[in-house]
Amino acid sequence: MLDKSLPYKSIIMRMEAAVAERLAPPAPAAGYRIRPFVPGDERHWARIETSVGEFSEEAAARAYFERVYLPEAALQCLFVVTEQDEPVATATTWTEEEASLRQLQLQWVAVEPAHQGRGLGRAIATAAVRRAVRLAPGEAILLHTQTWSHRALRLYR
């Protein structure tokens, strides 16, 4: 959950490609597995992101996802799912391209509150970074976060 009691400050973290390429494969907790986006998962992304306070309404979250990510979601979005294939955590990678600048980013890492504390955030973030560097070898990856996500900062170190 976001801790909005703190003043908001933007934080940019960078992982060099050599470090990202050496990350060990993620190991989700027993009863969970990681899978890529499949059509219809935009509603799960919206539910998960709203559950952690990133959006106030699922409809707004879904509209954002559809506008920004949907055309390439299968390449960029991963989920941690339960044994019943219910998504409970997500992470998205994105390549920002502006003029001749290209920057790989990890975005929207979230775990539903009922499933937090089981290492799922670390597992999904690691899986997303590993997948991104396979698709864009040699590129560093940025993570934009904020002080409201201070609990997650340990995860990103």
Which residues does each PLM region occupy?
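Acyl-donor-binding surface of acyltransferase catalytic domains
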Residues: M1-A30, V38
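A short beta-loop-alpha structural element at the N-terminal edge
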Residues: R33-W45
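A short, internal acetyl-CoA/4′-phosphopantetheine-binding micro-motif in the GNAT/acyltransferase core
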Residues: Q107-G117, T145-Q146
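Structural preference for long, well-ordered alpha-helical segments within the folded cores
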Residues: A127, R131, R154-L155
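Conserved GNAT acetyl-CoA-binding A-motif
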Residues: A132-T145
